[in-house]
Amino acid sequence: MRQVAYSTFTIIRILDNKMAHIIQFDNPATIVLRRGELFDYPKLTRVISGKTIWESTFPIEVDDVFIAMSDGAEYAGVGQELNFGWTRDSIADYAIANYLPENSAKSTASIIIDECNRLYEGRPGDDTTIAVARVRNRHPVNLVVGPPEHKEDDVRMMNLFFAKEGTKIVCGGTTSNVVSRYLHQPIIASLDYHDPEIPPISQIKGVDLTTEGVITLAKVLAYAEDFLDQAKLASVWAVQKDGASLIAKELFENATDINFFVGRAINPAHQNPNLPITFGIKQQLITSLADCLKRMGKHIRLSYF
């Protein structure tokens, strides 16, 4: 063995939400997608201690996607499905073919790494790392669950909830009634069960999504915990139309800032000792979900009433 220390690296910095600064050494060149097409960004070279460093600085645009990778990605398929491996250009073509403006950075990385794993036939011959960053505008989401502990606080809670900018999600039957009275709009119920385990969603004019409460949020929490692990269930909630899946997609992929409005009123049904532990006090459920969302990099604010 040569016993020589060796390291490749890719550094991507976003400066003042205006400029991208990329520094690269011996990794495949970072792929940048702009408006779904390959963006040929400027590159300068700098030699340090005999090593050539590539450096780039350029203005960013909303929805720019940065895809950095180790050389294991280029070696995927060598001697198996592909004679010369999966080249950077081929990886860029694959990313473009699978590009959707709404795709999160995580989903884009998963799409590419899954294809690498397929080309390696599940037996990677080299370290294979994909890192993705996406430039986006902030997207606030506001979620209210449970009525206030004191009924006289209903209007105050609703005033604060509807004063917030962003998507509005209402969880729980009693909460929906409070919102319905406040907006003077009827609740339009649905009997469409997209998932037999999740109660159907409803419609209230002025609200983006109306769902059942604890059962639905318990499922969202399960999805969140899985998402932070191996995201094996992401293929379920990404396409399903039940309340838990719709909330998961909004919170995990779309939201940047999430405001929870949590009523402290206790629903006696949730105190049934025969129900699983996830059906305990809703504050515990929301706290656990908020912790997961913080680990996803979301900005969280909890308000109790």
Residue ranges of predicted features:
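Active-site-proximal, acidic helix/loop segment immediately C-terminal to a metal-coordinating Asp/Glu
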Residues: 65-115, 268-275
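Conserved beta-strand-loop-short alpha-helix elements that form
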Residues: 24-25, 59-82, 133, 171-175, ...
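Active-site glycine-rich loop that binds ribose-phosphate moieties when present
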Residues: 45-56, 113-114, 149-156
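Catalytic core of PPM/PP2C metal-dependent serine/threonine phosphatase domains
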Residues: 1-36, 53, 106-133
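PP2C/PPM family metal-dependent serine/threonine protein phosphatase catalytic domain
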Residues: 28-57, 210-216, 222, 230-235
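Non-transmembrane, aqueous-exposed alpha-helical and coiled segments at domain scale
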Residues: 137-167, 176, 180-305
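Acidic loop->beta-strand submotif enriched in PP2C/PPM serine/threonine phosphatases
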Residues: 5-9, 40-79
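A generic local secondary-structure boundary/capping motif
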Residues: 10-11, 20, 54-58, 117-122, ...
